[in-house]
C-alpha cells in the first residue's frame, strides 16, 4: 500500500489524498455505531464514531484483515458542525482504533441516516496484499 502525495502538495492531516494498493478487496456496507445487539450505547457523535470504527474492524477480521488494510473510508454524518466541534476528541479515538493508518477519506453531511438514532455511518474498502 502506498500513500499518494503529488509533488508540492501539503501533507493532509488525518487522511491521504490517494492510496495505491493491490490484493484481495474487502468492502463493508455502511456501518453505524451500534453494538452487536443493534443498540446505540451512545447518543453522542464521538461515541458512535468509535463504535462504528470498531464495527468496521470486526467485519474486516472476518476475512483476516485489520485497520492497517483500510485504503478508503466514506464517513457520513448528520451534523458536520458537531463533527468539527469534536475533532479534539475524535483524534485520540482514531489513534486508539486505527493506529497510524490514514486512508483516503471523504466526509459527507447527510440529512439523516436510515437508523434514526445514528449520527454517523462509515463505509470502508480494504486491500489485503496476497
Show where each model-derived region lies.
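N-terminal presequence-like segments and the immediate start of the first folded domain
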Residues: 1-71, 77-130
